[in-house]
Amino acid sequence: YTFEPTGESIPYAIFVPSSYDPKGTEALPLLVSLHGLGRSYDWLMGYHGLLDQAEESGYAVVTPLGYIREGWFGSRPAEDPQDGVYSEQDVMNVLELVRDELRIDSDRIFLWGHSMGGGGTYHIAAKHPDVFAGLGVAAPAPAISAPMDEILDKIAHLPIFILQGDQDDLVPVFATRTWVAGMAARGMQHLYVEIEGGDHSLLISQDAANMQKFVDFFNIVGQK
């Protein structure tokens, strides 16, 4: 699509389950999925189990670029500060495009991300706290766009699933434990799974069982 602030063409990828009938009435739940630093817009589509599980549970999946590969979705300063603003804006633009194109259940829009995308999940949910029904983060690079307490206060009403490996060499496990402690202190509905021996990337990108944990969590919190 054309990104209006710059006139650039920005890609995104979308998966639609085979159960969706364009002429029907049933609305789809949606997984807005945010990639890690330096990855392409469709990188998450290759994560083991994601599309199979989305097909089985009837989810649409969309993977925005975030304007550039290193935009941090606004959660941290990009090399050009304007890129961070555009990175967040691209995600919200793509969400609206999908909602215009498909029948999306507004009560079952979930936001999740891996690494940089985890930080982006924290940031975007805090900026748009009434859009999403639940959150998920895997090995999340802590958002620094605002103090942790300020971000958690804004998302305290949202259920969140957190996946972290204790041998992560990019996002130290203690950093994620600190955020989880903040969630617990607020009485947030959260589920924290710490993987013994888990690394930064393969614990989610190449592990369908861990990917299933996210989908299962969203299935539960999205029940009507």
Regions found by a protein language model. Name each.
Residues Y1-G24:
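N-terminal cap/lid segment of alpha/beta-hydrolase-fold proteins
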Residues S9-P11, A27-R103:
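Serine-hydrolase catalytic machinery in alpha/beta-hydrolase-like enzymes
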Residues S18, L37, L65-I68, A141, ...:
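Short beta-to-alpha linker loops that shape the active-site pocket of alpha/beta-hydrolase fold enzymes
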Residues T25-L28, L44, P81-Q89, A126, ...:
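Soluble non-cytosolic domains of exported or imported proteins
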Residues V32-G36, A139, Q164:
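The conserved beta1-alpha1 loop
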Residues G46, R99-D100, D107-K154:
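Primarily recognizes the serine-hydrolase "nucleophile elbow" in alpha/beta-hydrolase
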Residues I155-I160:
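Short, proline-enriched alpha-helix->beta-strand connector loops that line the catalytic pocket
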Residues F161-L163, D169-K224:
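C-terminal catalytic histidine-bearing segment of alpha/beta-hydrolase fold enzymes
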